[in-house]
Amino acid sequence: MLSMLLFGIAFGYLEAAVVSYLRALHEPARQLFYPGRPPGELFPLLTIEQAQAAGPEQPKILIIEIGREAATIVMLAAIALAVADNAGQWAAAFAIAFGTWDIAFYAFLKLLLDWPASLLTWDILFLIPIPWVGPVLAPVIVSASMIAAGLCHLRQEARGERVLLGVVLA
C-alpha cells in the first residue's frame, strides 16, 4: 500500500496548495465584514448574504469548492479501486489513502500557512452534505484510525485470515 501512502501525501500537498489560494482569494471579502480579523482565523464564517454582497464571484467559488470536495472523494475512491482486488481491499485502500491525505493536508497547511495554530484550532472540516466544523484534532484522530484499520485489514488478509471490511472473522 505504499502507493496509497504516496498518493495521499502528494494529494494532501495539492489540496493544501489549493486551500492556500482560496484563503488568499477570500481574505478581502472577510476583511470587508470582519476588519482586523487575523488571516488565519476562519470564524465567524461569511453568511450567504455577505458573500453575495462581497461580489458575484464569491458564491460561485463556494459552488466550485463543493465540487472540488466531491471530486476529492471520487479521486480517493478511484485510486483505491485501481489497486484493489476485492471489496475489502478497496475499503482498506480507501481508508489508507483518505487518512494519509487528510493528515498530510493539515501538515502541509502548517508548512505553507503556519496554520493551524494547534490541533485544537477549529476548522471547516468538510462542506458535504452540510458544513462540518470542529477542532483539527478530530479529523486527525479519525484519519489515523482509518490508516490503522486499513493496514490491519490488509495484514490479516495477507496472513490468509478471513476478513470482512476490517473485521477479523476467526
Predicted region positions:
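Interfacial segments of alpha-helical transmembrane regions
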Residues: 1-7, 83-100, 159-169
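Extracytosolic (periplasmic/ER-lumenal) interhelical loops and adjacent juxtamembrane/interface segments
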Residues: 20-62, 66, 118-131
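Small-residue packing motifs within transmembrane alpha-helices
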Residues: 4, 8, 12, 95, ...
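Transmembrane alpha-helix/helix-exit interface in multi-pass inner-membrane proteins
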Residues: 12-24, 99-117
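Glycine- and acidic-residue-rich phosphate-binding/metal-coordinating active-site segment common to enzymes
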Residues: 112-140, 144
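Membrane-helix exit/interface motif
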Residues: 72-86, 108-115, 152
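Hydrophobic cores of alpha-helical transmembrane segments in multi-pass inner/ER membrane proteins
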Residues: 72-79, 134-152
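Alpha-helical membrane segments in multi-pass integral membrane proteins
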Residues: 138-146, 161-170
